[in-house]
Amino acid sequence: MQLGTIGVWTSYRPFGPARAGEAAKLVEQLGFGAWWVGGSPQVRDLRPVLAATSTLVAATGILNVWRSDPLETAADDAELRAAFPGRLMLGIGIGHPEATSDYRRPLTAMRSFLDALDASPTPTPPDERCLAALAPKMLDLARARTAGTHLYFVSPEHTRLARHRLGPGKLVAPELACVLDTDTDRARAVARAYAQSYLGLGNYTRALLDSGFTEADVADGGSDRLIDTVVPQGSAGQIAEHVRAHLDAGADHVCVQPLGEDGIPRASWTALARALIG
């Protein structure tokens, strides 16, 4: 599957599902290789993105196992793959214990979900699915059963750790939220506000601690060092340097998520495409 080196990450929430096709056309025209659709979508929700484009890869970023039936997922996946071959990446995640009362042992639950996908009448191809894997054992499962991992809210150091754990030949595709604004105080305020919900989730804070940040860094809204690393701010050229840091750390593909622009983020996507793709 040709994800390309640079993609975008966004849910439909900022502009509404009815405009997904319009947004997808812009993403493809700008030269991005993939759109990772956030907001815990079902596979069927990606049809407008695929139908509006001819080469763009659509990816679930991510499908939540607690909210998804594996047999329905496999059937929807097979239907879209038949209609749009080579253009669908099934990103699967376990979510967070803070977000669901049904949260059980995450590794066991993910393994069971993959088993059900494989046993379905229309099994999903292992090389066209990936896991949102932060912890070492989940990364091991991603290596054994999927194409690799889609990381979220991580530093380049975590990308390096993931690459080391997965080894060569496996997908490492981190998301990178960013703020295109050269006013440092204003941009950092946007980045810090965005980061708050993630700093309240144990899976993310443990991953940040494992990649070299301290308890002080993750406390009280996040240190400037943490915020500036995980949610960089500045010009498109400055953001491109952070993208390159992930690529240098072993990422195959980085999906950028510009913050702070209402509706379809045309200006941000255009500026990032010029800086990252040319």
What are these regions (language model features)?
Residues M1-G278:
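Active-site-adjacent structural elements that line small-molecule/cofactor binding pockets in enzymes
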